[in-house]
């Protein structure tokens, strides 16, 4: 019997959910679909620079699952960029983390104030 599916945790829904090459009508484009969880994995690892173990903990998944999700997301983004495809971010099984960002496993919300000299 397979393990039950764990609900993944994300910090927020992406502000923009669709990207396409400029100057090409939508009707002529192929499309890659990136799940909301895959977008969150990219954000945590590539944008915030978290280690995979930290990012997996924040998303409430195992490190190997995070690694597979990150690989899939990077493949889809690279394919869309290099082959002129549209990229849609939607879908998945997730919950939005309601904790304030300073209580999560990520860097603090605000940068440290500059030191006075």
UniProtKB/Swiss-Prot annotation:
Any Pfam family matching the protein: DUF134
Return the protein name: UPF0251 protein cbdbA217
Similarity section: Belongs to the UPF0251 family.
Q: Which PANTHER family match?
A: PTHR37478, UPF0251 PROTEIN TK0562 (PTHR37478:SF2)
Q: Which Gene3D superfamilies match?
A: Winged helix-like DNA-binding domain superfamily/Winged helix DNA-binding domain
